[in-house]
Amino acid sequence: MSNEFITFEKISRKSWKQLHQKSKPLLTQEELTNITSLNDNIDINDVIEVYLPLIHLIQIYKIAQENLSFSKSLFLKKDIQQRPFIIGISGSVAVGKSTTSRLLQLLLARTHKTSTVELVTTDGFLYPNSTLIKNNMLNRKGFPESYNMELLLNFLDTVKGGQTASAPVYSHEIYDIVPDQQQTFTNPDFLIIEGINVFQNQQNNRLYMSDYFDFSIYIDADSHHIEQWYLERFLSLLELAKHDPANYYARYTSLPQNEAIAFAKKVWKTINLENLEKFIEPTRNRAELILHKAADHKIDEIYLKK
């Protein structure tokens, strides 16, 4: 962390957990295990010490947004239009974005019992593999140019306008967009958008995805720790794919482990690390909140925009 974070207040985990005194976790260990991503590490104590204070903070932002919306409607002499409270979550591949997103979805639903809380990932807005292959971009998958940004921004604009919107569905098992399958959203109360690219400058240089966000989170960690998590996850995916020939990773299951690790290290260095250093990490100061993870996946520091 450097002067890049001069606009953030650094908060230790010890101080953060004291900002919210509720000790009831709102979910069971079994529920937490079911939403935890492969090779991630989180327990009930993390929920109580980190995520319950975060839910309380999000509630503060939501009340402020509602008050501003009400005041603007009075000023403009217009009726208030109900719009989703949109939360953007970004960070590297294998850093734990999906676990955080699913956990927030569940906790928000438990604390706002009459509200609808939806989750969408930007993976669904990747171009299909056939398009990437046609344009010789398959090895650039995950980089900014591999996303259909026009479709993604149109989706966000439609959702933010309170209208029904649909998003393509991505499958990590087939490593591609699922044909003829859509995820539909009808004016939810909360919408969580998770992806490596949610803070990136768009190709027209005029509009950011984050322009649509009411709150935003960046999951941070040292790159050598993320690399280790990525390699561990890759080996776990190979184990799962051994008995599923339709799985994308099945093609790598016949490799000796040392060759599989060497392959994963090459992918990390030439694709994921480059993407992280050039396009993902430089955007973290656009987040409202940064959650920093230590080597054991545990959040040890929190940075809140002043």
Swiss-Prot record:
Pathway: Cofactor biosynthesis; coenzyme A biosynthesis; CoA from (R)-pantothenate: step 1/5. CDD domains: PanK. It is an enzyme of class 2 (transferase). It catalyses: (R)-pantothenate + ATP = (R)-4'-phosphopantothenate + ADP + H(+). Keywords: ATP-binding, Coenzyme A biosynthesis, Cytoplasm, Kinase, Nucleotide-binding, Transferase. It is found in: Cytoplasm. It comes from Streptococcus equi subsp. zooepidemicus (strain H70). InterPro entries: P-loop_NTPase, PanK, PRK/URK. Pfam families: PRK. This is Pantothenate kinase.
